[in-house]
Amino acid sequence: MIFDKGNVEDFDKELWDAIHAEEERQEHHIELIASENMVSKAVMAAQGSVLTNKYAEGYPGNRYYGGTECVDIVETLAIERAKKLFGAAFANVQAHSGSQANAAAYMALIEAGDTVLGMDLAAGGHLTHGSPVNFSGKTYHFVGYSVDADTEMLNYEAILEQAKAVQPKLIVAGASAYSRSIDFEKFRAIADHVGAYLMVDMAHIAGLVAAGVHPSPVPYAHIVTSTTHKTLRGPRGGLILTNDEALAKKINSAIFPGLQGGPLEHVIAAKAVAFKEALDPAFKDYAQAIIDNTAAMAAVFAQDDRFRLISGGTDNHVFLVDVTKVIANGKLAQNLLDEVNITLNKNAIPFETLSPFKTSGIRIGCAAITSRGMGVKESQTIARLIIKALVNHDQETILEEVRQEVRQLTDAFPLYKK
């Protein structure tokens, strides 16, 4: 019987080898992709539970199937914990991803063809904030705002003038590659001035917001969307928050039946675990450590005139570096660092001149290394290793030295093999 085949290693060796190889990669590589993190074993256990067997279309207390009394408890726990964590009146935990959460928010707030003001992808926004290749750009009339050409930071006066000119129905704040704190109160004032809704996508900073080390958008935005991984350190999934009861009903309808069928209750259970972890006072220490580590790492690049730190610094978990003085483009930098077991991604910088497939910059985030227990000293060491590798990109002997130093670091801070 299928129930006898409980061991993946014995039943499907080919698949197991790939899983095991990924486990080894995570153990022995330094993870600096800003959208990635390392979840607890409790989060993984919940996601791998028998809840994966259960269909539960609808919401707690109002399902289309029977036998949902247990998953109602699970989902209610996740909802209540999310509300408490972020100080929101309403929470939807069913969105399968941040993109699904954003799609639901758009459906709740605007109609197809409406004008939306969102952060341009090249300035640090996200695909779902109006990229022409994404559903958002195809469905709605997005106009992009950028950063100041000199400071590479948001210029709220310029955004206000742009909002006056285009008269959007919705303004989207939030980013996927912006290293500075966002003033959500100013964004709400801009939205109110032109009679627009304000939606905030806090996917990247949700963990920092939950811990109180970054300003919260919840008091200001009509709707807040997020992922549950990244700095929040939960399973891959989406979350939607609001303080408006009428909008909460629209959000629920947009998710089901608008965009999705049955929710992934095993993932929702893992979200509930992650929310409980984030409610622990120790999570604030973790979030502050992310900020401290990121600032320390960024400072090393700022002190080296062969590199240019975008906007001159960072206030959160991420920063961008222009690497073109030492290597041709960000793509080559990403590939080279992969070879020495440091994982990050190429990234466009504001007012980019290279192809998006090459880019001038790299994006670096410190959530994952902080989860391993690394601190300021290790963050500075990693920055120096990156510089050492990039500057000596054609010196195999030096690159091998970097590999060995990376291995020493990862061995000193094991992930799951403790």
From Swiss-Prot:
Name of the protein described by the UniProt record: Serine hydroxymethyltransferase
CDD domains with a match to the protein in the record:
SHMT
Which cofactor does this sequence's record say it needs?
pyridoxal 5'-phosphate
List positions binding (6S)-5,6,7,8-tetrahydrofolate.
121, 125-127, 355-357
Q: How does it assemble?
A: Homodimer.
* Major place of residence: cytoplasm
UniProt pathway: One-carbon metabolism; tetrahydrofolate interconversion; Amino-acid biosynthesis; glycine biosynthesis; glycine from L-serine: step 1/1
The reply on keyword Cytoplasm is yes
Top-level taxon of the source organism: Bacteria
Instruction: Show the GO MF annotations.
Output: glycine hydroxymethyltransferase activity; pyridoxal phosphate binding
Q: Which NCBIfam families match?
A: PRK00011.1 (NF000586)
Q: Does the keyword Transferase apply?
A: yes
- Family named by the database record: Belongs to the SHMT family.
The alphabetized list of GO BP terms reads: glycine biosynthetic process from serine; tetrahydrofolate interconversion
Q: Where in the cell is it found?
A: Cytoplasm
- Assigned EC number: 2.1.2.1
Catalysed reactions listed for this entry = (6R)-5,10-methylene-5,6,7,8-tetrahydrofolate + glycine + H2O = (6S)-5,6,7,8-tetrahydrofolate + L-serine
Record's keyword terms, sorted: Amino-acid biosynthesis, Cytoplasm, One-carbon metabolism, Pyridoxal phosphate, Transferase
Organism, by scientific name, is Streptococcus pyogenes serotype M5 (strain Manfredo)
- Pfam families the UniProt entry points to: SHMT
What this chain does, per the record? Catalyzes the reversible interconversion of serine and glycine with tetrahydrofolate (THF) serving as the one-carbon carrier. This reaction serves as the major source of one-carbon groups required for the biosynthesis of purines, thymidylate, methionine, and other important biomolecules. Also exhibits THF-independent aldolase activity toward beta-hydroxyamino acids, producing glycine and aldehydes, via a retro-aldol mechanism.
Q: Which residues form a coiled coil?
A: none
N6-(pyridoxal phosphate)lysine occurs at which residues?
Answer: 230
Q: InterPro entries given for it? A: PyrdxlP-dep_Trfase (IPR015424), PyrdxlP-dep_Trfase_major (IPR015421), PyrdxlP-dep_Trfase_small (IPR015422), Ser_HO-MeTrfase (IPR001085), Ser_HO-MeTrfase-like (IPR049943), Ser_HO-MeTrfase_PLP_BS (IPR019798), SHMT-like_dom (IPR039429)
Q: Which HAMAP family match?
A: SHMT (MF_00051)
